[in-house]
């Protein structure tokens, strides 16, 4: 190894130069040591606990306590826990507090638990017998945060819906005062009064159970030693009258404690517990002030609400009528104000009455032309009323017109009428034509009791129109087999009609089973292969033929193979066990079941694709999926239409049908599913339509719930109707698509598989193969009806008066759009899946009501044909026009956007105008929800919208591991100088789905997935609609980590990003996976070329705290799945990454100009692709230098050049054999660093 002192100094410089200051999110204070460690004890007891699973806690020098519990449980009637506790008498009053930091938590197991607990009885240390005791606790249970207690039965109250994940910190406390208990988590409080919960001793402490590793710090126990003999309460300054649902206000209440020594002390709110408050019902409400065993009562008066104002928010969908029409209130929404603004709410229909001309509006028929007022009167306070006007035209009805007849015009005796598809219009004397609702006309004349032509008449307002239908008697068409016996036989077997059912078939589709029929199997020859006719006869009918097959018995050869991406001989293999079972292994990271391709261990046999089969086996799951799962692990039975080359780790795709353990995504449930992939036309995944799945059992399979601990027998079958899956003897589920495996090969490869992380043991295998030619014919199920819906896609908040209302139906139909009472469009045809836009002018600084009426076209197969009425309000507002909008962490929606009265961030984003700047004042903007810049919230090329830090500040938008990060779907935004931190698990810190955006001088860290990612934020499959022409400039991304520790990159432009996206002058380091990820999926298709210019990637794969990830760990990952995309990377540096510095990741078309790589663990440069793919790499001016013996560089098809210094395993040389010296390397490095520093 060469002398590298100079390089070490330079590397230190690089690390200091490129590492910006660390997160501005406030750090937690040092833990407060437990004052008397001898008072604390530890016990692990209860079901499923053991020395191995529940080791003694680690007591740290700072007083923190780490408890690791891989055994135990919190169940409905037992507790098995690791418990660090102290003892106090049951009559003691005290408070225990602690911070619980999650180091590991199995989020899919409801019996995993941790937190604070007070327990009545504890089990003997290291006794694993079942234990059940009264207790009260606050912490994790049922995968979320709860307050819960055991007293006869387990009672649970949700506190936080958050599932704990690695790095989360929960501030917990339990305060006991007499029989009252106050439980708190992160500021959320629950109070319980529980007499008799404890007997003699209370065991107070911290605990963990099942699969949790928790660090408890600031553990503090405070015992109240004062002897209170009485309380006095002064109500003179306290509010004692409340409206319904008004919160308790203790301001002005004086509570004084009197002690046994004769002294007295006025208490604070923290010193006493208030119980019994309930303002939900008018009347007297008695509350108790509790301190220890002493309590005082206070009577409060709860006053009923009084309606003081009504407002019509949305007019009815119909406000224009003709004489003789009935009033229709559909769509009407009324807002009530109670007690002069105390409460404002939308009323239900029973809370108000409608009157027209002094009469109830229900079924009111308009008999007078002109304008009429509809009164809206409060039923709660009839003196409060409002109203609106409707218009009645004096035009008279002239005729009815059938614009479309019903779909069904032929009937059988006894059929009910079906008017689906009938469209009727009324014509009026003013030339208008109005479509009638089904409720507006009557239909008479249908009679199916006798055959013949029937005239059906439509009636409306005294006018009629008629159409004809035909009624006939049903006729027997013949007989058919409705249940099939065995139809495939091996030589030597005899025909068996068991299970055969024959039915009469009528022309209306009815079937009636026959009991009297004969079967003639004389032509069947069980000694000779062939297809034979079995004749079925019944009196009065022509005989029918049941075909059966006789074939040679085939001994199917079983084989083992591993193939596909991420597989290897060390991770993917098959073992044949002494007990006759087959063990199929995919160790962690060994393969995957991805949306469009697979990498699997496969134990299989081959059958003819024309045949059907049933394959069953008992499955023992020894290991499956880490926690949390990463979405690509799977096991079970699989059938596929092609397999890869043995031992080849290239991308390989086929159509599949499978049953077994599967999730399909980190956010999807992981259970036993039937799933299929369709549309794949070639091994590269072209044409893939992705994976569809049906959940059979929503429980993660593992050693405890699979064979032999529990029955777990999987069955996968192919029939002429489709692919069928079944667990044990449960209900069959089916995909009615039998031909999906007839694409790539004339064979079906069927067997048992494992991927990513799964080890299974397969036994009692049963395979039955039959001839599809003679099996039961294909059943095509009726098409499932579509539930009609209408999306309103446009903004509900805007700063523009010129507005476009955008709607998108999922079925064909017609829409009418109203703005208030004004009709903007009427009965316009809209198509399923297509957007339709209606222009409107908004009233400035007001709320603008819209009503959209959608009538589905009833010629479609729908679950409902009722019209859909959607009310939608658009708030138009501006702030500080002509100036900047200021926001602060303490800003509110009621600010005016000035520096002295700032807005909150969401309001500013919703109402910023084109060309206007949102200025973020300094501070931490802590959130528990996503920050969304919606589609259509756009700037323009000339006037962007700005979201920038106040000069001299560094604001932090902290999602607190609860919010889903930033979603930027708008266009032409400029975002600068802001930190984006700690998004929720499996969500990027910042995702760009819009176009022409610039993000500059921002940092992304500690997020639950990639720091910043460019990918679509909707469901568009068209690359033209994917995010394009976005620039990321001088940004830094680090310490991003997903729960599975294998997916969070620093920056990404992958999967579904368009053209023209650029990263300039950015730095990515210490991310759990890659620095940059430009992954492309074959099934989704090529993404747009990305430019990476003057960027740096270092130390990726390891976090700043030393945590080593389980992902790829590359610096720049520049593609995926062999899809050619001409990404350009230039003037960039990669060093000290956990894997490869610059990798094409199978993309055969990367262009790399003037880049430097140094000491990357698995190579500085790896530009390769899969076998059979022609490469078109361009590598020019590449400098690769290594002092730690990494693998040699690889660039397939790149001719040697004097401009490239590639590492050959020992030294860096160019085409002429000139070796790059350390001095020359440093000079080139400094030159490039200088160039990167100049980026602005």
Curated annotation (Swiss-Prot):
Ca(2+) binds at residues 325, 349-350, 1049, 1073-1074, 1077. Its EC number is 4.2.2.2. Its main location: secreted. Induction: Appears to be constitutively expressed in various carbon sources. Gene3D superfamilies: 2.60.40.3630, Single-stranded right-handed beta-helix, Pectin lyase-like. GO terms for biological process: symbiont-mediated disruption of host cell wall. It is found in: Secreted. Keywords: Calcium, Lyase, Metal-binding, Secreted, Signal. It catalyses: Eliminative cleavage of (1->4)-alpha-D-galacturonan to give oligosaccharides with 4-deoxy-alpha-D-galact-4-enuronosyl groups at their non-reducing ends. The active site is at 1117 (proton acceptor). One of its GO terms (molecular function) is pectate lyase activity. Residues 27-551, 545-1240 are annotated as: Has catalytic activity. Residues 1-26 form the signal peptide. Optimum pH is 7. It comes from the Bacteria. It holds the Pfam family Big_3. Inhibited by the metal chelator ethylenediaminetetraacetic acid (EDTA). Coiled coil: none annotated. Optimum temperature is 65 degrees Celsius. Cleaves polygalacturonate or partially methylated pectin. When assayed on polygalacturonate or on pectin, it releases monogalacturonate as the principal product. Belongs to the polysaccharide lyase 9 family. This is Pectate lyase L. It comes from Thermoclostridium stercorarium (Clostridium stercorarium).
């Amino acid at each position: 190894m060469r002398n590298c002192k100079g390089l070490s100094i330079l590397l230190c410089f690089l690390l200091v130069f490129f590492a910006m200051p660390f997160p501005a999110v406030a750090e937690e204070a040092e833990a407060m040591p437990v004052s008397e460690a001898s008072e604390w004890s530890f016990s692990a007891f209860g079901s499923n606990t053991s020395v191995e699973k529940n080791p003694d806690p680690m007591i740290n020098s700072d007083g923190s306590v780490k408890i690791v519990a891989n055994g135990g449980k919190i169940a409905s009637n037992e507790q098995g826990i690791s418990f660090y506790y102290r003892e106090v008498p049951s009559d003691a009053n005290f408070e225990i507090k602690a911070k619980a930091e999650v180091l590991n938590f199995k989020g899919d197991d409801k019996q995993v638990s941790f937190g604070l607990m007070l327990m009545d009885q504890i089990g003997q240390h290291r006794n694993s017998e079942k234990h059940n005791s009264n207790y009260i606790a606050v912490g994790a249970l049922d995968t979320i945060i709860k307050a819960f207690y055991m007293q006869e039965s387990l009672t649970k109250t949700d506190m936080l819906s958050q599932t704990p994940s690695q790095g989360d910190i929960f501030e917990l406390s339990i305060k006991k005062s007499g029989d009252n208990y106050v439980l708190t988590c992160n500021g959320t409080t629950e109070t319980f009064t529980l007499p008799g919960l404890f007997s003699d001793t209370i065991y107070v402490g911290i605990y963990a159970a099942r699969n949790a590793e928790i660090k408890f710090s600031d553990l503090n126990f405070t015992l109240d030693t004062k002897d209170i003999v009485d309380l006095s309460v002064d109500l003179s300054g306290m509010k004692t009258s409340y409206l319904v649902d008004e919160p308790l206000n203790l301001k002005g209440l004086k509570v004084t404690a009197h002690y046994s020594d004769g002294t007295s002390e006025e208490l604070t709110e923290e010193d006493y517990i208030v119980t019994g408050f309930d303002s939900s019902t008018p009347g007297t409400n008695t509350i108790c002030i509790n301190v220890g065993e002493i309590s005082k009562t206070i009577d409060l008066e709860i006053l009923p609400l009084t309606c003081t104002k009504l407002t019509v928010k949305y007019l009815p969908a119909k406000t224009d009528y003709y004489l003789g029409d009935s009033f229709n209130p559909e769509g009407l929404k009324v807002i009530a104000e109670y007690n002069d603004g105390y409460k404002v709410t939308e009323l239900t229909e029973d809370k108000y009455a409608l009157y027209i001309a002094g009469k109830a509006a229900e079924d009111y028929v308009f008999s007078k032309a002109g304008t009429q007022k509809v009164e809206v009167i409060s039923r709660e306070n009839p003196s409060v009323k409002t109203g609106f006007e409707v218009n009645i035209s004096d035009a008279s009805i002239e005729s009815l017109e059938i614009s479309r007849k019903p779909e069904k015009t032929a009937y059988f005796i006894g059929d009910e009428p079906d008017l689906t598809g009938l469209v009727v219009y009324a014509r009026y004397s003013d030339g208008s034509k109005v479509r009638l609702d089904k409720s507006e006309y009557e239909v008479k004349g249908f009679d199916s009791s006798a055959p013949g032509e029937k005239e059906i008449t439509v009636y409306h307002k005294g006018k009629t129109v008629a159409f004809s239908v035909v009624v006939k008697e049903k006729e027997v068409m013949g007989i058919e087999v409705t249940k099939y016996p065995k139809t495939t036989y091996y030589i030597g077997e005899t025909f068996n009609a068991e299970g055969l059912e024959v039915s009469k078939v009528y022309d209306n589709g009815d079937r009636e089973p026959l009991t009297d029929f004969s079967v003639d199997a004389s032509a069947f020859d069980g000694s000779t292969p062939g297809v034979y006719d079995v004749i079925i006869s019944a009196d009065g009918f022509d005989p029918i033929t049941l075909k059966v097959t006789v074939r040679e018995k085939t001994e199917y050869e079983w084989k083992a193979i591993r193939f596909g991406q991420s597989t290897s001989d060390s991770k993917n293999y098959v073992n044949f066990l002494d007990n006759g079972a087959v063990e199929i292994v995919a160790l962690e990271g060994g393969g995957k079941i991805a949306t469009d391709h697979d990498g699997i261990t496969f134990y299989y046999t081959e059958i003819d694709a024309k045949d059907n089969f049933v394959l069953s086996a008992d499955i023992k799951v020894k290991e499956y999926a880490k926690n949390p799962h990463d979405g690509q692990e799977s096991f079970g039975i699989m059938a596929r239409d092609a397999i890869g080359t043995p031992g080849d780790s290239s991308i390989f795709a086929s159509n599949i049908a499978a049953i077994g353990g599967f999730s399909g995504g980190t956010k999807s449930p992981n259970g036993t599913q039937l799933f299929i992939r369709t549309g794949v036309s070639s091994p590269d995944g072209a044409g893939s339509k992705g994976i569809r799945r049906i959940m059979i059992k929503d429980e993660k399979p593992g050693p405890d719930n699979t064979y032999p601990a529990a029955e777990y027998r999987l069955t996968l079958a192919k029939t002429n109707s489709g692919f069928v899956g079944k667990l044990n003897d449960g209900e069959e589920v089916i995909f009615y698509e039998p031909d999906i495996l007839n694409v790539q090969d004339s064979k079906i490869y069927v067997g048992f598989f494992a991927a990513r992380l799964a080890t299974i043991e397969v036994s009692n295998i049963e395979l039955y193969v039959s001839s599809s030619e003679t099996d039961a014919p294909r059943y095509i199920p009726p098409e499932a009806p579509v539930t009609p819906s209408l999306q309103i896609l446009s903004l509900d908040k805007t700063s523009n008066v010129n507005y476009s209302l955008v709607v998108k139906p999922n079925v064909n139909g017609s829409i009418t759009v109203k703005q208030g009472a004004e009709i903007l469009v009427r009965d316009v045809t809209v198509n399923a899946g297509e957007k339709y836009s209606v222009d409107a002018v908004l009233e400035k600084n007001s709320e603008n009501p819209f009503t959209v009426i959608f009538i589905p076209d009833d010629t479609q197969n729908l679950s409902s044909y009722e019209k859909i009425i959607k009310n939608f309000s658009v708030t138009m507002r501006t702030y500080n026009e002509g100036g900047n909008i200021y926001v602060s962490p303490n800003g509110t929606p009621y600010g005016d956007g000035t520096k002295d009265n700032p807005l909150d961030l969401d309001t500013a984003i919703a109402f910023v105008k084109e060309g206007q700047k949102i200025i973020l004042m300094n501070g931490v903007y802590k959130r528990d929800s996503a920050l969304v810049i919606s589609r259509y919230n756009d700037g323009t090329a000339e006037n962007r919208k700005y979201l920038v830090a106040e000069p001299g500040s560094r604001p932090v938008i902290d999602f607190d591991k609860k919010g889903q990060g930033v979603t930027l779907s708008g266009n032409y935004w400029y975002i600068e100088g802001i930190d984006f931190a700690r998004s929720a698990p499996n969500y990027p810190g910042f995702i760009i789905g819009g176009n022409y955006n610039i993000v500059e001088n921002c940092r992304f860290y500690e997020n639950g997935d990639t720091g910043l990612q460019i990918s679509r934020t909707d469901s568009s499959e068209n690359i033209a609609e994917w995010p394009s022409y976005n620039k990321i400039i001088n940004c830094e991304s680090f310490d991003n980590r997903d729960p599975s520790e294998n997916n969070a990159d620093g920056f990404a432009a992958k999967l579904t990003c368009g053209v023209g996206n650029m990263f300039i002058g950015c730095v990515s380091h210490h991310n759990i996976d890659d620095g940059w990820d430009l992954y492309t999926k074959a099934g989704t298709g090529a993404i747009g070329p990305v430019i990476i210019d003057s960027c740096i990637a270092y130390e990726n794969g390891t976090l700043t705290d030393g945590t080593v990830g389980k992902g790829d760990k590359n610096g720049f990952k520049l593609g995926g799945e062999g899809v050619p995309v001409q990404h350009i990377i230039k003037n960039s540096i990669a060093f000290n990454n956990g894997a490869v510095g610059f990798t094409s990741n199978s993309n055969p078309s990367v262009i790399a100009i003037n880049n430097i790589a140094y000491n990357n663990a698995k190579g500085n440069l790896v530009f390769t692709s899969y076998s059979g793919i022609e490469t078109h790499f361009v590598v020019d001016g590449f400098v690769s230098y290594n002092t730690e013996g990494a693998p040699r560089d690889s660039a397939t098809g790149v001719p040697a050049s004097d401009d490239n210094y590639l590492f050959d395993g020992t030294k860096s040389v160019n085409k002429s054999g000139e070796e790059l010296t350390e001095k020359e390397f440093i000079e080139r490095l400094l030159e490039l660093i200088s160039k990167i520093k100049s980026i602005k």
